[in-house]
From Swiss-Prot:
Keywords: Ribonucleoprotein, Ribosomal protein, RNA-binding, rRNA-binding, tRNA-binding. It holds the Pfam family Ribosomal_S7. One of the primary rRNA binding proteins, it binds directly to 16S rRNA where it nucleates assembly of the head domain of the 30S subunit. Is located at the subunit interface close to the decoding center, probably blocks exit of the E-site tRNA. SUPFAM superfamilies: Ribosomal protein S7. It comes from Clostridium perfringens (strain 13 / Type A). Transmembrane segments: none annotated. Part of the 30S ribosomal subunit. Contacts proteins S9 and S11. GO terms for cellular component: small ribosomal subunit. PANTHER family: RIBOSOMAL PROTEIN S7 (PTHR11205). This is Small ribosomal subunit protein uS7. Belongs to the universal ribosomal protein uS7 family. GO terms for biological process: translation. GO terms for molecular function: rRNA binding; structural constituent of ribosome; tRNA binding.
Length: 156
């Protein structure tokens, strides 16, 4: 925590093709070793694959997928009287988006397709259909929160 007050959030510029800040964040998360051009190509190619395979607008599929991935609740460890409790808490909107993108990319990277553009497109289409590893991660997180509902009164 900083000693000199609050640090302002840096604003992300919307991407040039879809004019969306969320797509910019996706590109920034896909990026490795500062290679933004490569990351943009991967994302835009994945969106092109989605357009071809589904016949729907890629942004629609992307937004639907993100809504199916982003968690509403998560658990946070809290130490009380020598015991650690998993306390369910609501997730702030900014963190919801961050976790959604993180889980989407983790699930994409674990997939079996040869190219990242295909893995990302596949995971986005699966998530839009409420299947896939990223959606399962969200369901598991919600189950953990539900199972530990009894400790909700220890909330921060």
């Amino acid at each position: 925590m900083p000693r000199k007050g609050h640090i302002a959030k840096r604003d992300v510029l919307p991407d040039p093709v879809y004019n969306s800040k969320v797509v910019t964040k996706l590109i920034n998360n896909v990026m490795e070793d500062g290679k933004k051009g490569v990351a943009q190509k991967i994302c835009y190619d994945a969106f092109q694959i989605i357009n071809e395979k589904t016949g729907r607008d890629a942004m629609e599929v992307f937004e639907e997928a993100m809504n199916n991935i982003m968690p509403l609740l998560e658990v946070k460890a809290r130490r009380i009287g020598g015991a650690n409790y998993q306390v369910p808490i609501e997730v702030r909107p900014e963190r919801r988006q961050t976790l959604g993108l993180r889980w989407l990319l983790a699930a994409s990277r674990k997939r079996g397709e040869k190219y990242m553009r295909e893995r990302l497109a596949g995971e986005l289409m699966d998530a839009a259909n409420n299947t896939g590893a990223a959606v399962k991660k969200r369901e598991d997180t919600h189950k953990m929160a539900e199972a530990n509902k009894a400790f909700a009164h220890y909330r921060y």
